A protein has these predicted regions:
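SAM-dependent transferase fold signal centered on methyltransferase-like domains
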Residues: 1-402
């Protein structure tokens, strides 16, 4: 990818501008490759939020919008580094990223190794990666323009392989199984572990975690990773020569927050089955909502047991306690009032409020429907939870942050 000095100057001068307006004004800049410039401007604008360290580096090249949307963030890439850096996982000399993409994960992970290989079948992405790795002085990374499966078959053994299969349903259908992704890691598992003692698999949070743990035979740990309470990635560590039944696999529920605090919960499915979880139709002083990673992983009884909180209903996934628990891995609220769906009670609950933050958990109406009925805009200091209690009573719970 070659950009003229004039196009590069245009990118620098307009990097914070609205790209739609720039596209409409393209005729004003006959000596500038405006379409190419817009790709770079959009890429950098996304990177400012997603990969700030790269956005701050002058000269980084960016791929198309789709590749930028699909790539890992700086925060999740750093978390992968922590996984691979675990001293219990043995040697870290050689590494191969079989699905290179924009190269974020490869760039961050390669810092842990003496030699690394970036493999990507799209030539444009290889060109971008080679430029950026050189700019970032990542001399230990070799860029390979090749199909991942073909490269895997012919490569020399390494210590670690990273692979990020893409969901391949082109019709908007819901992809939930590893076998529906490309490449199919379940079909390649034996070959992957012939070539590496450890494999780190990144999966979409849309996939079924339980199904993935059954489909792969050598999973040693699963990491469900959220950023600011939005589930972003499922990460599976495969280890050669070791097998665990799915019920014994450690599952790390991680929420990386804007305040740099990390919410963690570790559980295994066997313990989850054995834990008791008390249900209550009575609201206590505080309301607790587990973070997105815990909800995705299904650690509902474990949360109750570890933090000594009672659940409102088997399907509501909200908990209550008279004790304030500052390190609870999720959102924490002080309950101020509650109401049935009776008009008088609702009027008393809402009062003169014009807006509130509304959440629905196990309730026969959507957020949009309730917002319209209650005539409330989004925002403000009030948090409303529409849910069902253990006695099947439908309730609106008003809360504030403690």
């Amino acid at each position: 990818m070659t950009l003229t000095e004039e196009t590069l100057r245009f990118i620098r001068e307009h990097r914070k501008d609205n790209v739609r307006n720039l596209a409409l004004q393209a005729h004003k800049y006959p000596t500038v490759d405006v379409p190419a410039a817009i790709i770079q401007i959009v890429g950098r604008q996304i990177a400012e939020e997603k990969i700030p360290a790269w956005a701050a580096r002058e000269g980084i090249l960016y791929p198309t919008h789709l590749s930028m949307e699909q790539c890992s963030s700086e925060v999740t890439a750093n978390y992968k580094v922590k996984i691979v850096s675990d001293t219990g996982y043995g040697s870290r000399k050689t590494f191969t990223d079989l699905t290179g993409g924009f190269g974020i994960d490869c760039a961050f992970l390669s810092a842990c190794f003496q030699q690394s290989a970036y493999v990507e079948r799209q030539e444009t992405l290889c060109t971008i990666a080679a430029h950026n790795f050189s700019l970032l002085n990542l001399k230990q990374v070799m860029v390979c323009h090749e199909d991942s499966i073909r490269y895997l078959q012919m490569m020399e053994p390494v210590d670690w392989i990273f692979i990020d299969p893409a969901r391949r349903d082109g019709h908007g259908g819901k992809t939930i199984a590893i076998s529906e992704c490309e490449p199919d890691v379940s079909a390649l598992e034996n070959l992957l572990l012939e070539k590496a003692s450890h494999v780190l698999v990144k999966l979409s949070p849309m996939l079924d975690l339980t199904l993935a743990l059954h489909d792969l035979k050598h999973v040693q740990a699963a990491h469900v990773v959220s950023v600011n309470n939005e589930c972003k990635e499922l990460l599976l560590v495969l280890e050669r020569g070791k097998e665990l039944v799915p019920e014994e696999i450690p599952i790390h529920c991680i929420n990386l927050t804007a305040s740099q605090k990390v919410q963690k919960l570790l559980f295994i499915r066997q313990q989850e089955k054995e834990h008791t979880c008390p249900y209550t139709p009575t609201l206590k002083t505080y309301l607790y909502e587990p973070n997105a990673s815990i909800l995705k992983a299904g650690a509902f009884r474990s949360v109750s047991s570890i933090y000594n909180v009672e659940k409102l209903h088997p399907n509501s996934h909200l908990y209550t306690s008279d004790e304030y628990i500052p390190d609870f891995p999720g959102r924490k609220f002080r309950i101020t009032d509650s109401s049935s769906l009776n008009k008088k009670e609702l009027k008393k609950l809402i009062g003169t409020e014009k807006k509130a933050n509304l959440t629905v958990r196990n309730f026969p109406a959507s957020v949009a429907e309730l917002r319209k009925r209650l005539k409330l805009a989004e925002g403000g200091d009030i948090y409303l939870f529409a849910t069902t209690l253990a006695d099947e009573k439908k309730l609106l719970i008003a809360c504030k942050q403690p």
